[in-house]
Design a protein with these regions (language model features):
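Hydrophobic N-terminal alpha-helices or hydrophobic patches in metabolic proteins across all domains
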Residues: 1-250
Length: 250
C-alpha cells in the first residue's frame, strides 16, 4: 500500500491512472507468470507448488469476516443501536442513517466480503491459475485503498469485468442451496445486466436465497446474519464440489 500511495503522489503519474495500474498490477503479474514458466518444468512442477500456495494465501482475504462482526452482533442483540452504529463504523467501516439501514448494510458487507475475499479468488485460481488470482487481489487492493478517484475508477472498471462471471455463478449456487424461486426472480432481471455491480447482485441474491426478513433489532436481527453465514458455508461446499468435478473431468 505504501507503493500505491507513493505512485499516486507522483507528479508524473498523477494524471496517468492506467500507468499506475500497469506498475501495480500488470508488472507483478507478469513477473509471477515468468517465474512460473521457469519453475513449472523443473522437478515435475514441485518447485512451483510453494509459489502457488503463497500467491493463493496472499490473494485470499485476511481475517475472519464473521469474527469481525462480533462487537456489532453483541450490540445489536442488546438493542443498543448507538453502540452498534459505533462498532460498525469502527470495525468494518459501515454506517447508515437508520438502524434498519445499518443492519441491511452489515448484511451486504458480510456477503460482499465473503465473495471478494474467497469465492472470486478461488474461482479465478481454478480457472486461470495464480496469475488471475493475484490480478484480482491487486485490483481489489487498488479499489479499496486508492486515493486518486481516477485510479479507483479504472480499477473498478477492470474489477467489474473480473466479477461479472463468478458473481453470477455464486448467485446460482445460492439458488441451489437456498430459496430457488426467490433467487430466480432476482436473476431473471439481472442475469445479463452489465450495469449492476457485483456487490448489489450478491446482496440481492443472498438475501433472497436466505429468505431474510425486514430488519429487526434484537436477536432476530442477529439471526439474519447467522442465516447468511450458513448460506455462504453451504455455497462454499458446493463451490468446492463443482471445482472437484471440473478437475476430474479435465
Amino acid at each position: 500500500m505504501r507503493e500505491l500511495h507513493k505512485l499516486e503522489a507522483s507528479t508524473r503519474l498523477a494524471n496517468r491512472p492506467w500507468w499506475v495500474l500497469v506498475i501495480l498490477v500488470l508488472l507483478p503479474v507478469m513477473l509471477l507468470g515468468l517465474l512460473l514458466v521457469v519453475l513449472d518444468p523443473v522437478a515435475y512442477g514441485l518447485l512451483a507448488l510453494p509459489v502457488h500456495v503463497l500467491v493463493l494465501v496472499f490473494s485470499l482475504g485476511r481475517g475472519d469476516v464473521l469474527a469481525g462482526l462480533g462487537p456489532f452482533r453483541d450490540a445489536w442483540r442488546r438493542g443498543d443501536l448507538q453502540a452498534a452504529a459505533h462498532v460498525a463504523q469502527r470495525d468494518i467501516d459501515v454506517c447508515a442513517d437508520t438502524g434498519e439501514q445499518l443492519l441491511e448494510n452489515v448484511q451486504a458487507h458480510l456477503l460482499w466480503q465473503a465473495y471478494q475475499s474467497f469465492f472470486a479468488v478461488i474461482f479465478w485460481y481454478f480457472l486461470l491459475g495464480p496469475v488471475a488470482a493475484l490480478s484480482y487481489r491487486l485490483l481489489a487492493l487498488a479499489v479499496e485503498h486508492g486515493k486518486n478517484p481516477e485510479l479507483v475508477e479504472r480499477a473498478q472498471q477492470l474489477r467489474h469485468a473480473f466479477d461479472w462471471l463468478p458473481v453470477r455463478l455464486l448467485a446460482a449456487r445460492f439458488a441451489l442451496v437456498g430459496n430457488f424461486a426467490a433467487v430466480s426472480r432476482v436473476m431473471l432481471h439481472e442475469l445479463l445486466s452489465w450495469d449492476i455491480s457485483a456487490a448489489q447482485l450478491i446482496d440481492k441474491a443472498g438475501c433472497a436465497a436466505a429468505e431474510i426478513p425486514p430488519p429487526q433489532t434484537g436477536p432476530e436481527g442477529v439471526s439474519s446474519l447467522d442465516a447468511l453465514w450458513e448460506l455462504l458455508l453451504r455455497s462454499a461446499l458446493l463451490w468446492y464440489a463443482g471445482f472437484a468435478v471440473w478437475t476430474l473431468l479435465l
